[in-house]
């Protein structure tokens, strides 16, 4: 199941879901080119001692006003908090805290307590109040 809230902008994305998994994308989220959401894992993994199948399929949750940079990869179990930003080509299957900037493979938080705006970069803008888009203020946790 895929839930996409209002005012979500998706440049291009691939969403792979099977069975009972859910991908949820919160309102006012921006998803850049070639982003992949993958709940499904194609092959089975087993515990070597018990020979029992390991649980693999979990939901993916993206909060409100999240910015996913180009070619991000969200795997089963990923949870991205409100107002967070994932840098280009970042990958995660874990939790990224709200209002944080995460980059890398695997993604790690490099900055907390951020707000982002859809306005293009302009060196004259010194605060969020200089921007037309101030939606990030609504999602501070």
Residue ranges and their predicted role:
Residues 5, 18, 38, 92-102, ...:
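Contiguous hydrophobic segments
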Residues 67-118:
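Active-site/pore-lining binding-face segments in mid-to-C-terminal subdomains
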Residues 34, 52-55, 89, 126, ...:
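Short amphipathic alpha-helical patches
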């Amino acid at each position: 199941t895929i839930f996409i809230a209002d005012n979500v902008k998706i440049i291009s994305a691939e969403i792979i879901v099977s069975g009972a998994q859910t991908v949820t994308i919160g309102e006012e989220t921006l998803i850049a080119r070639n982003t992949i959401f993958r709940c499904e894992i194609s092959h089975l993994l087993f515990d070597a001692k018990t020979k029992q199948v390991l649980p693999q399929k979990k939901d993916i949750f993206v909060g409100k006003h999240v910015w996913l940079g180009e070619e991000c990869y969200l795997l089963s179990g990923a949870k991205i908090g409100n107002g967070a930003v994932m840098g280009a080509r970042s990958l995660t299957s874990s939790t990224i805290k709200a209002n944080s900037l995460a980059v890398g493979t695997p993604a790690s938080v490099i900055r907390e307590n951020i707000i982002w705006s859809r306005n293009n970069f302009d060196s004259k803008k010194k605060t969020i109040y200089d921007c037309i888009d101030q939606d990030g203020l609504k999602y501070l946790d």
